């Protein structure tokens, strides 16, 4: 196959992480189950928030958008993955691969930025409660979300355009679940120094800056909570941000396992970590946010038409 990766006929072979038919069947049913659970969980969160005026607050506004992002995120990768598990033809066109990569980068970035905005929301609610209504006005919430979307779209476009300049040659076999940046760069036969430098530099800004902001927010939140004299009030206050803290830990923990390493050390063992951030995290987010949320339990009960009992 020649090195002209701009050809409309260019293709990759998306081989997945196993070529065993038996293992592929197991993986098919596993990922199908996880996909259905993810879709159901995030759709229920969106329906619950949109159907009850008591949940029309900044925190739930951002949570609904996080659920929408997670829903879009898994739909970008898993359906193609399921088709490949059941098909002998593993080919994915170059254009389709780049499209998948674009949405993957954009949606991961959007997830990251929304989590940072949610941390700011919790900071204002706990550290500056008297100013919460004015500080988190509907106009500001829409503006913050628009900035998140804009930065995510531009960042995904930047990396995708840079990837479009990379030349591939030899066997274009992707032993992975989807078209992922590091995996594609390992297949390149042209110099990838520039794109790798841009990837590291922009990645540090796009991901570490929000992480630093969230860390600073939680330092102030913890300090404020420690000043509360009542133990029960401390617990109640902390519980309002515990779910967000759990999601942030899961999101950044799995991303760090995959991306905080040199390109030349990237290997198939990182597939497990990739599955964690690409599939497990979007699946777990609705459960984490609704597990101990009494308001969410009541609304979900009405949406489902039956009582929604919190697990003992």
Curated annotation (Swiss-Prot):
Which keywords accompany this UniProt record? Cell membrane, Disulfide bond, G-protein coupled receptor, Glycoprotein, Membrane, Olfaction, Receptor, Sensory transduction, Transducer, Transmembrane, Transmembrane helix
For this protein, the parts annotated as crossing the membrane are 26-49, 58-79, 101-120, 141-158, 197-220, 238-260, 272-291
Q: Enumerate the Gene3D superfamilies for this protein.
A: Rhodopsin 7-helix transmembrane proteins
Q: Does the keyword Ligase apply?
A: no
InterPro entries from the UniProt entry: GPCR_Rhodpsn (IPR000276), GPCR_Rhodpsn_7TM (IPR017452), Olfact_rcpt (IPR000725)
Q: Where in the cell is it found?
A: Cell membrane
Residues on the Extracellular side? 1-25, 80-100, 159-196, 261-271
What the record says about family reads:
Belongs to the G-protein coupled receptor 1 family.
What is the name of the protein in this document?
Olfactory receptor 1D5
Native species of this protein?
Gorilla gorilla gorilla (Western lowland gorilla)
